[in-house]
Regions:
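Active-site pocket-lining/capping segments in soluble small-molecule metabolic enzymes
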Residues: 1-251
Length: 251
């Protein structure tokens, strides 16, 4: 679950329930601005104290350094938490996997840029080194911008009408008429642009992968239950709004 939801008090009851029923991981942001580092560190500390946190999904190496400081300040043992290297690490080869193991990671997420052949080779040759996970459903983030597209600024101003807090959905439309959803983060004034199509992959093709991951943004509970059923059955969604990513492309 993204860190920003641990900051917002209105989600506290939901997070409390989830932490009791499931293994709860804090998903750290790709961009952490220097002037927000202390604030986010404090938010992580509060989340660890308030909920049963199983581990963290890290977006880059700087996240690891940040967590080292946070856990030290809380007098907590790093080995009591699981660390997952997110797809943003762009792990392409066995050397990178071994390096992650040395850094203390417990699992790595396969890069969406890899094709099927490379994924199979990477997972099968590292089963004894580091566990792997594959995103089999979800819209892939294409870009993280250090800027708010809705407010047209790199920070929040008092006169901003805060479109980011509304329930509306916002998109960028390209010359082909495809809509790319944008989701702002009003904590740091960062915007994420998502792919116009949703990735959907057959899990049965990747028997050496340890974990299959589902990324949801604003899907309903019924949609999520349907997604879980499809993934568990080893199938994928079909239709023009879905894609199998780069599975059939050359790397």
């Amino acid at each position: 679950i993204p860190l920003k939801y641990f900051v917002n008090k209105k989600y506290s009851n939901i997070l409390e329930t989830l932490s009791k029923k499931f293994e709860l991981y804090i998903y750290l942001p790709t961009i952490i601005k220097a002037n927000y580092r202390n604030l986010l560190s404090l938010n992580i500390e509060n989340a660890i104290k308030s909920y049963n946190i199983k581990g963290f999904v890290l977006s880059n190496i700087s996240n690891l350094l940040l967590l080292d400081n946070v856990l030290e300040n809380c007098s907590l043992n790093k080995n009591n938490f699981n660390f997952i290297a997110n797809y943003t690490f762009n792990i392409f080869n066995n050397h990178s996997v071994k390096e992650l193991k040395e850094l203390g990671f417990n699992r790595f997420t396969i890069s969406p840029e890899l094709n099927k052949e490379t994924i199979l080779d990477l997972t099968s040759s590292n089963t004894e080194v580091l566990a792997s996970e594959l995103i089999v459903y979800g819209k892939t983030p294409l870009m993280n911008m250090n800027y708010c597209l809705l407010g047209k600024a790199n920070k929040c101003y008092p006169n901003c009408d805060a479109k980011c807090n509304s329930c509306n959905k916002y998109y960028l439309k390209d010359r082909l008429g495809l809509n790319f959803e944008i989701i702002p983060d009003n904590i740091q004034t960062v915007t994420t642009i998502y792919n116009s199509k949703t990735t959907s992959i057959e899990s049965t093709d990747f028997v050496s992968t340890n974990v299959f991951r589902i990324d949801v943004i604003d899907e309903s509970i019924d949609d999520i239950n349907n997604i879980v059923s499809i993934v568990k059955s080893g199938n994928r969604f079909e239709g023009k709004e879905f894609t199998n990513g780069n599975l059939n492309r050359e790397v």
